[in-house]
Amino acid sequence: MSISSLSRKNIQALTPYQSARRLGGKGDIWLNANEYPTSPDFNLTHRTFNRYPEPQPQAVIEGYANYVGVTPENVLVSRGGDESIELIIRAFCEAEDSILYCPPTYGMYAVSAETCGIALKTVPLTADFQLNLPEIERQLTGVKVVFVCSPNNPTGTLVNRTDLLALLEMTRNKAIVVVDEAYIEFCPQATMVTELKNYPHLAIIRTLSKAFALAGLRCGFTLANKDLIEVLQKVIAPYPLPVPVADLAAQALQPAGLQAMQQRVQEILQNRTALEADLRSLPCVENVFQSDGNYLLVKFKDGQKIFKTLWDQGIILRNQHSALMLENCIRITIGTAEENRRVIEAIRKIA
């Protein structure tokens, strides 16, 4: 008997999420994980490594609450946004329940549900990467949690606000709606935070991994009404944030840290505009999809060839060819101006 055969049946059948690091690669240009290209500079100020950390570090909770304009009771901090996804599924889904999500989108919604033994329902996005609301409404029976990513990863599109409000109305008293705003700093006007007061079943996922350039910290947040946060507090690990992580996260949420984040956002937006224009000039490019994130989804005439050739040159992008509706598509994280120049130069040589 193998050890694997002793594991739960759903785990035996599970295909793990293929993160950028799991997929590997060797090179000096990494534009496959929607990270910021350089690291911010912080120094540890707390060195009480012999003591367990605060269950919910006050400086982090208050700093993030002030940043987004809510009260501390509306904030839960976790080990990245991925833990928020799993917490919500564990806290709200019974064995007979389902989650619903809309591909092509972030893969961890499905993986987290499958890990917990929860069934999946999918309603693909429309041709313009928006919600298919009539079909979602038809599929809601037995659904306890609906996940929507806006801006959506990997397409970069914002979900129409009117559609999100319609979704919240049709799920009232039926299901939790989770809006994943991992990339919202690149389009802050689109946040759903102002709707928390109107919808007790709305949860919003945030992170320090993208615009804050702190992917290595693994620090995320759930924003929701007090009652929903209290449910999640029942199932979260006792000490989710190590002392060094809480220390650096709190610094990032101070005025100087927020100003640096906003400067990074402006830099990324400028580089995104330039990269988009350069990509559109290439004959091998069929489409560059409009993006509100720190990445571009690009459809090539032969995406597989482009991806493999650049991979072999040490330029690591994210292949989306196998994702629903994304044949020959590659997602390109916005890098430095020099990194973007090298991407264009490499693609131009192939074409």
UniProtKB/Swiss-Prot annotation:
Its EC number is 2.6.1.9. CDD domains: AAT_like (cd00609). The modification N6-(pyridoxal phosphate)lysine is found at residue 210. Keywords: Amino-acid biosynthesis, Aminotransferase, Histidine biosynthesis, Pyridoxal phosphate, Transferase. GO terms for biological process: L-histidine biosynthetic process. InterPro entries: Aminotrans_II_pyridoxalP_BS (IPR001917), Aminotransferase_I/II_large (IPR004839), HisP_aminotrans (IPR005861), PyrdxlP-dep_Trfase (IPR015424), PyrdxlP-dep_Trfase_major (IPR015421), PyrdxlP-dep_Trfase_small (IPR015422). The keyword Phosphoprotein does not apply. Transmembrane segments: none annotated. NCBIfam families: hisC (TIGR01141). Homodimer. This is Histidinol-phosphate aminotransferase 1. It comes from Pasteurella multocida (strain Pm70).
